[in-house]
A protein has these predicted regions:
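A detector of single, family-specific signature residues
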Residues: 1-308
Length: 308
């Protein structure tokens, strides 16, 4: 078992395995490989560790790559087991609980599913950052009394983005800005012109320009994530042996905000053999996220009550 820390890891094995059953290792990669070497020399096959921050990830992945069965456990579960003595270290206590089978491993996806989850989580962080930059743009516009949001339902829609890019490019004429109006926009040209008559100040224009540039960067990175997600799904499909029938008609054809930039339904159907979006309330992205978090094999949860 390993007591994971930021600057060092304390490893403990059974006293019958070595004359020095508790050892301390650093956190550099060569330290982690020495830790794995020591476990192998002592005949260790399974290792338990607590999920401490993100510090567990490097040692977990290296041990898995070296062929160990690694159990990631919730620190709360280990602390609530009675009978601990005061003269025993955290690593020794964790090792003893593991030896007697008293630890419950947290579910962690493996292989391509783990990669899929990582790409999806990175994508969500980028979408959240994009929303922050949109708020910064809205603030800059309001400070200049440019009330685009009152005449355009979505400032990041076709009309809104055209107007924002024109402003950043140097256009100030309300008539010229209003000419960017999309034919589907409900507001008339005159109303848009009045809304686009602003108090142009250099510092607010600068903030708008930077927020728009950062938004564009986030969107570019989201597209890059989508490509990684699509490629990962294709690799998962190649590994799966699911019978693929005909894809049923979509329950809804409405495109959701921040939707993934490829046909998620078709990709998931090829992986799973069923269309999860036929379940009421389960859209393409939510189905994709479910697969990314839980994988394609739900045997880790014997029943719905275990799914927490």
């Amino acid at each position: 078992a390993i007591d994971v820390g930021a600057k060092m890891h304390v490893a403990a094995i059974g006293p019958d395995r070595a004359s020095e059953p508790v050892r301390t290792f650093g956190t550099f990669t060569d330290d982690l490989n020495r830790l794995a070497d020591w476990f192998q020399e002592c005949g260790i096959e399974t290792v338990a560790m607590e999920s401490t921050g993100v510090y567990w990830i490097p040692v977990f992945e290296i041990l898995e790559q070296r062929g160990f069965e690694v159990l990631l456990v919730n620190a709360r579960d280990a602390k609530h087991v009675p009978g601990r003595k005061t003269d025993i270290s955290d690593a020794q206590w964790l090792q003893r609980l593991h030896e007697f089978g008293l630890l419950r491993a947290s579910f962690l996806p493996k292989g391509e599913i783990a990669a899929l989850r990582a790409y999806l989580r990175q994508r969500e962080r980028l979408v959240e950052l994009s929303a922050t930059h949109i708020q910064h743009m809205q603030k800059a516009l309001m400070q200049m009394n440019v009330q685009v949001h009152h005449v355009v339902s979505d400032i990041m829609g076709v009309t809104g983005l055209r107007i924002l890019r024109a402003i950043v490019a140097g256009e100030r004429d309300p008539g010229v800005l209003a000419a960017n109006r999309d034919r589907r926009c409900h507001a008339d040209v005159e109303t848009i012109q009045r809304a686009l008559t602003g108090n142009w100040r250099a510092e607010h224009l600068f903030a708008l320009e930077q927020a728009l540039a950062l938004y564009d960067t986030c969107q570019e990175k989201v597209v890059a994530c989508d490509k990684k997600i699509e490629a990962t799904l294709k690799r998962i499909e190649a590994q799966s042996a699911k019978p693929v029938g005909e894809l049923p008609p979509a329950r809804s054809t409405k495109r959701q905000p921040n939707a993934v930039d490829f046909d998620v339904r078709t990709a998931l159907h090829a992986v799973l053999g069923v269309d999860l979006t036929q379940i009421h309330g389960l859209g393409p992205y939510l189905a994709l996220k479910l697969v990314g978090e839980c994988g394609t094999d739900l045997s880790a949860w014997p029943s719905a009550k275990h799914f927490t």
